[in-house]
A protein has these predicted regions:
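Active-site core segments that coordinate phosphate-bearing ligands/cofactors
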Residues: 1-192
Length: 192
């Protein structure tokens, strides 16, 4: 479908929507909040009009939907509410994705100047250990914002898309094991 991740931004913006295509990337099952190690990946909603761009966009959308599900689960578990999410890593350079994520979360999404913060975090820990920084406040002061994305999507459209995602996820979940039935030779006890 694509040869490099950088192509996905152009593919996602070339079309107005995913045309009802959803991708559930359950290649090794689903983790939180679904906890189904036996579920399998799924692409659904394909039609004769579906293109590579629709599938690529559905892939990007799936990351935002998974983030939505995780944050919702954290809030239901009593986690502190926040109106800002900071992103990093390779997908963070994709403006379309960052905007979509912001709309799905109904929260601002902040992208740092340096998107490779995983490696930077290891460097910060080493620097703290040798005394380069005195405390975490000094480390936090080094973070620089490159751009902020604010939610833009119509709430009704957002709800339709999230409901479509949850329908797709339900299709991947392993059905519960059947309830064991009494075996031959076992009698039931009846009240007289």
């Amino acid at each position: 479908l694509i040869t490099h991740a950088s192509q996905t931004d152009d593919m996602a913006t070339r079309i107005p929507d995913s045309h009802g295509v959803y991708m559930v990337p359950a290649f090794v099952g689903l983790g939180a909040p679904h906890w189904d190690p036996d579920s399998r990946g799924l692409i659904c909603g394909l039609t004769l009009g579906s293109t590579q761009a629709h599938i690529a966009r559905a892939m990007l959308e799936s990351v935002a939907y998974q983030t939505y599900d995780l944050i919702r689960a954290m809030r239901e578990d009593g986690a502190m509410r926040t109106s800002i999410l900071r992103i990093d890593g390779g997908m963070a350079v994709n403006d379309w994705f960052a905007q979509f994520l912001s709309s799905m979360l109904k929260a601002e999404v902040e992208r740092p100047v340096n998107i490779e913060t995983t490696a930077l975090g290891a460097a910060f820990l080493a620097g703290l250990q040798v005394g380069l920084w005195k405390n975490l406040d000094e480390v936090a002061a080094t973070w620089k914002q490159e751009r902020v994305f604010a939610p833009k999507m119509d709430p009704a459209q957002r709800r339709i898309m999230i409901d479509g995602w949850h329908d797709a996820v339900r299709r991947t979940l392993t059905p519960p094991a059947p309830v064991a039935q009494p075996t031959a030779g076992v009698t039931s006890i009846r009240a007289a």
